[in-house]
Amino acid sequence: MDSLEIEVIPRPDKDDRYTIKPLKDTLSFDKGFFLAVRAIQSIRKKSQGSVIVVGIAGPSGAGKTSIAQKIVSVLPKSILISLDNYLDSSRQIIEENYDDYRLVDFELLKKNISDLISNKPTDLPLYDFTKSGRYAYKRVQPPESKVLLIEGIYALHEEIRHLLDLRVSISGGVHFDLIKRIFRDVHRTGQQPHESLQQITDTVYPMYKAFIEPDLQLAEIQVVNKFNPFGGLLNPIYILKSVKQGVTVDMIHSVLNKSTIQENTARYYDIYLIPPNTTFANSSSCDWIRVRNADGQYSIMFSEEIKEGPFIISPRVDFVVGVNMLGGLMSLGYQMVAIIHRKSTIFKDGKIIISYDELEELGQTFVQIKGFDATSVQEAGKKLGLENNYLQKSYIELYQDKYKKSLSDNSTVTTLPIGGINNNNTINNNNNNNNNNNLSLSNFINSKL
């Protein structure tokens, strides 16, 4: 059967209802959406007027709501039920873990689904995350389109699986799911980014591996969402970078506003991690997480750099974390791949920043111009005589090139500057004991400072 062909078959558990033959391949978001709509239409046609129930499940931030809403947009007068509204605040919430399946009011959910399948009106609950409680009910009539969609991390759970005619799973890989979950929590619950990240490493992904991932493997349609969560970020930073070639301090002073200019020197210690099933040689900027130590304070940055003309355009999110967060990320399967020392002499006037960046591992000094206004950044580069001499790569990309070149030249291989901390045995041992992991990481990093 072609991967785009939908074959409707009787459900194994209920021969009077229908599903589709599972598709063998995982699908992109767009193809998954297209085939989900085709499958729903085909099952609906075969079901001759019965309400069909579609479950859409996946980890937090994977895109369940997005694909469900797109389906509703092309199948109007369908009903979309979000499992987020079925949290039961009367049940004990342990360590702010709202992803615990025991908090879901499956009895009410099953009643609502059964009512709608039986062409009866039903009262759907409404939940307020900012107040952590159910605040109202909404009466709905059976869907005129005969399509009922259930979306949520436990939408394929065994408690309701017998009610589903079609199962759709969606995931984005640990890295994108992690970032999108942080963005969602900040917007919806008012959490600070570091609080969301801590919760994810401590509770969300352990719950996912144990109680969600097995259900996703049962879906007839499996989607991998490659949506870039950085694409919608506002206020990107425009960066021009060049190898230092005769750019003097006096030249920099002449470019900046003399009345507001400030100068300082900073030393950074940047630790780069990549997600599971990724190698350093084949990784890209959207894969990396950078943990920076500056004067004993750690910050984490997710970055997706876009290249346009001479610019590196860098939408990013960064926030302060504790050193123990490294252990949490490694417990998710992230690996340390590089630790890079950097000394920056920084000149800024409130509008743009110009710096000399000395990279120990690269053995070079660079001039970098940054700002939120592309025109101002470009004009500064022109005045410094850097036009036609720009590099469109981040420092970790330049180091990656050096590493790959040493491999291809069969010369002395450039070793990754990580002190051997991320070998497989160390990672396995660390995963078995997060406390020891956090302590050893902290000691290792502090010894390098």
Swiss-Prot record:
On the tree of life, the source organism's domain of life is Eukaryota
Part of which pathway?
A: Pyrimidine metabolism; CTP biosynthesis via salvage pathway; CTP from cytidine: step 1/3; Pyrimidine metabolism; UMP biosynthesis via salvage pathway; UMP from uridine: step 1/1
Catalytic activity, EC: 2.7.1.48
Where, by residue number, does ATP bind? 58-65
The reply on keyword Transferase is yes
Per its record, the protein catalyses: uridine + ATP = UMP + ADP + H(+); cytidine + ATP = CMP + ADP + H(+)
Q: Which PANTHER family match?
A: URIDINE KINASE
Job of this protein:
Catalyzes the conversion of uridine into uridine monophosphate and cytidine into cytidine monophosphate in the pyrimidine salvage pathway.
Q: Which named protein is this? A: Uridine-cytidine kinase C
